[in-house]
UniProtKB/Swiss-Prot annotation:
Keywords: Cell membrane, Membrane, Transmembrane, Transmembrane helix. It is found in: Cell membrane. Its main location: membrane. The lineage of its organism: Bacteria, Pseudomonadati, Pseudomonadota, Gammaproteobacteria, Vibrionales. This is UPF0114 protein VC_0208. The chain crosses the membrane at residues 10-32, 53-75, 109-126, 139-156. GO terms for cellular component: plasma membrane.
Length: 162
C-alpha cells in the first residue's frame, strides 16, 4: 500500500506539465501584445511626444522582462519538479538550463519582480500629472516591499547555505 501511494504521489508531478505548457501560451499572448504596441507606435512615430515614446518603450521593456520571467519559471520549474529537459547540446542551448535549483530560481524570480516593478514605477513617475498622489505612494510602498522581500529572501538563502 505504501509503495502504491508513493508511486502515485511521485507520478502526480506530471500534473504540472500542462501548466508549464500553458505558460508557453501566455508567452505567445505577451508576444502578440508586444507587437500590437509596436504596430500602434509606428504610424505615429513622427508625431509622438518624446515622453510618450519613452512610456511606450518602458511598457515594451516591461513586457520583455515579464516574458523572460515566464521562460525562466517554465523551464526551470519543469526541470525541478517534472522531468529533466533532454535538449541536445548545441550553440543555442540556454547556459543556465539544468543549473537553477529552486533556491536560485526564487532569487532570480524576486530580482525579476523588482526589475519589473522598477520599470512600472519609472512609468508612473514619468506620468505623475495623470496619477493621484495617493496612488503614487502605494506604488512606491509596493516597490519598496518587493525590494525588501528580495533582500530578505537572498539573506535567508545565504544563512541557510552556511
Amino acid at each position: 500500500m505504501e509503495r502504491l501511494i508513493e508511486k502515485l504521489l511521485y507520478s502526480s508531478r506530471w500534473i504540472m506539465a500542462p501548466i508549464y505548457l500553458g505558460l508557453s501560451l501566455l508567452l505567445l499572448a505577451l508576444g502578440i501584445k508586444f507587437f500590437q504596441e509596436i504596430f500602434h507606435l509606428l504610424p505615429n512615430i513622427f508625431t509622438i511626444k518624446e515622453v510618450d515614446l519613452i512610456l511606450v518603450a518602458l511598457s515594451l521593456i516591461d513586457v520583455s522582462l515579464v516574458g523572460g520571467l515566464i521562460v525562466m519559471v517554465m523551464f526551470s520549474g519543469y526541470e525541478n519538479f517534472v522531468s529533466k529537459l533532454d535538449v541536445d547540446e548545441s550553440e543555442d542551448k540556454l547556459g543556465w538550463l539544468g543549473k537553477l535549483d529552486t533556491s536560485s530560481l526564487k532569487n532570480k524570480v524576486s530580482a525579476s519582480i523588482v526589475a519589473i516593478s522598477s520599470i512600472h514605477l519609472l512609468k508612473v513617475f514619468m506620468n505623475t500629472e495623470n496619477i493621484e498622489s495617493d496612488k503614487i505612494k502605494w506604488y512606491l510602498l509596493l516597490h519598496i516591499t518587493f525590494v525588501v522581500s528580495a533582500f530578505a529572501m537572498g539573506y535567508l538563502d545565504k544563512i541557510t547555505k552556511k
